[in-house]
Curated annotation (Swiss-Prot):
CDD domains the UniProt entry points to: Ribosomal_L7_archeal_euk
Species of origin: Methanocella arvoryzae (strain DSM 22066 / NBRC 105507 / MRE50)
Cellular component GO terms held in the UniProt record: cytosolic large ribosomal subunit
MF terms (GO), sorted A to Z: RNA binding; structural constituent of ribosome
Keyword presence, Ribonucleoprotein: yes
Protein name from the UniProt record: Large ribosomal subunit protein uL30
């Protein structure tokens, strides 16, 4: 599973990049989506790599995102009680583990919004003009995306 977080706006952006961000449902800065690893999403990530931060996410990080930022239709928070009532899983952590293993999808939870609206990172970005490998905030974080997600919880 990949976590993709939009970090830059759309001013002076090429139309194909805007379209790809729209297809990924990354309509605003600090929005986060979780997608599966397949060639289609890898190609889409490659197109928007200069506007987003992305990396491989684990079950614990996904559970943290869902607990802090998971919203239902109507704006209510995602709770353990809602998960237990509307699915075969007993808690958010159990559901997140199933999603990370590929046994379930985020869309299996009725009413769960597909986009997580994150806060700006605590202590700020490292810089939005450079990639993560160059000391900035954009591009591929790999497994270290969890640190950025933790700052933006």
């Amino acid at each position: 599973m990949y976590a993709i977080i939009r970090l830059k706006g759309s001013v002076n952006t090429r139309p194909e990049i805007k379209d790809t961000l729209r297809m990924l449902r990354l309509n605003q800065i600090n929005h986060c989506v979780v997608v599966e690893e397949n060639p289609t999403y890898k190609g889409m990530i490659q197109v928007v790599k200069d506007y987003v931060a992305f990396g491989v996410i684990n079950a614990d990080t996904l559970a943290m995102i869902m607990e802090h930022r998971g919203r239902l239709e109507g704006g209510d928070r995602l709770t353990n009680e809602y998960v237990a009532k509307n699915s075969s899983y007993k808690s958010i952590k159990e559901f997140a583990a199933a999603v990370a293993e590929g046994k379930a999808k985020l869309g299996d939870m009725p009413g769960l919004k597909p986009v997580f609206r994150m806060h700006p990172p605590r202590k700020g970005h490292k810089g939005l003009k450079r990639t993560y490998q160059q000391g900035g905030a954009l591009g591929n974080y790999g497994e270290e995306i969890a640190s950025l997600v933790e700052q933006m919880r």
